[in-house]
Amino acid sequence: MNRNTTTNKNANLNNSRNANAPGEAGHQNKTGLIYWTNPSKSGASFAATLVSLLILRNVNVISVLLKIGYMVLFTSFAVELSTKVLFDKGVVSRFGMQESPDLVGVLKPHIDRELDRLPALEDRIRKLVFAHRTRNNFTIGVSLYFLHGLFAIFSMNTVLIMTTIFLYTVPLIYDRKQARIDRAIDRMKDLVIHRFHKNYNKVVEKTEPYIDKIIPPQTDEGSYSTSISNENKSSTSQRNKSGLSSSEFDNMNDTSASKSGKDSYSTSQYNRAEYPVSQNENIGTLKSGKQEIPTEKDFNNRHENFSKPDVKTYDPRTVDIEEELAAHQRELEQNLKDGDYNLVGSKEIPDPITVPAPTRHTTKPAESQSIPIKNNETLHKTTHGLKQKLQHA
């Protein structure tokens, strides 16, 4: 009576526990040795595996097998020889096994069954190696990396013993406490993600120097847009610091850009050896240096302050370009009338390097013609070419 009452109480208690924790009912229709559905078989296989691994760890199996082999051979040899000497017939050859066991018939079904599974295994390996699913490729690659580190630290036998213990314990614990373990894993995952987002800026600041060392910043044409955006940001910050308006700051930038443009054009033209020449002058003669050299007095009279030509820059937002060009054209025509040959390579004006300085004539000079000037850059290019000619001469 009392025994039945105690049994019923235990059964009700177990049912209430299973109702409160439905995810921890146990086994959940899973069968196999590792889930201990049959404790006797699972315990026997677990014990046999551990004992065999311990034997392999403490005993040299190859040495034992070789010792057993030569002992069997020496024993059969001694018995066969002694019986032939004493009885004229060998006992071992007479009463020994006359036919070999049919190992092929026993092993062939098992081998065929395993070979039938081989094509599917080959297909899975092929898809894994050639990354048909990158997630599986990455997951198994990480697993192999950790296994490599594990085998580098521990011996193979130790790893096998640890694997056997985990194989027979971890699935059973997870099967019985699945809901609780899943909640703990989700909590840890959320905590890691929260900490990562919280410390994201610190991680970026600490890793940025190392990333710059591994991947240096681009300096080629591909980084042109990035450099332009950075330049715009720096100019904006500079304008805000100086307290200038946008129009005043743009005028300052245009002036500095025109100055730098002169220097860069002069350097590039000199490096490429592109010198403007007159129509009747050969470029080979100019590069060989055989042309007539003008005197220093003639050079000073014609080209004062030649190293820094007075070339104005224009802002199209504040200056009328056509009016300025007309004024420059009138100024150049007046200089040409006065004898200041400031252009090289034109059809109307001779080259001052190949033609000597003009002498005074009593005859009436020919009527001068106006030379069209496209823009102020023409004057700068021609005067710079004359300077390079004189330097090479």
Curated annotation (Swiss-Prot):
Membrane-spanning ranges: 61-81, 150-170
UniProt topological domain (Cytoplasmic) ranges: 1-60, 171-393
Annotated Gene Ontology cellular component terms: cell periphery; cortical endoplasmic reticulum; cytoplasm; endoplasmic reticulum; endoplasmic reticulum membrane; endoplasmic reticulum tubular network; nucleus
Bilayer topology annotation: Multi-pass membrane protein
InterPro entries: Reticulon
Compositionally biased residues, Basic and acidic residues: 289-313
Regions of this protein lying in the Lumenal compartment: 82-149
Keyword list, A-Z: Endoplasmic reticulum, Glycoprotein, Membrane, Phosphoprotein, Transmembrane, Transmembrane helix
Identification of the protein by name: Reticulon-like protein 2
GO biological process: endoplasmic reticulum inheritance; endoplasmic reticulum tubular network maintenance; endoplasmic reticulum tubular network organization; ER-dependent peroxisome organization; response to endoplasmic reticulum stress
Cleaved signal peptide residues: none
Compositionally biased tracts (Low complexity): 1-21
Keyword match Transmembrane: yes
Subcellular location(s) of the protein: Endoplasmic reticulum membrane
Residue ranges annotated for the Reticulon domain, each copy included: 30-236
PTM annotation (Phosphoserine): residues: 278
Positions of the UniProt region annotated as Disordered: 1-25, 214-313, 339-393
Biased composition, class Basic residues, residue ranges: 381-393
Source organism, top-level taxon: Eukaryota
Keyword field contains Iron-sulfur: no
A Pfam family that the UniProt record links to this protein: Reticulon
Polar residues bias locations: 220-285, 365-376
Glycosylation sites: 137
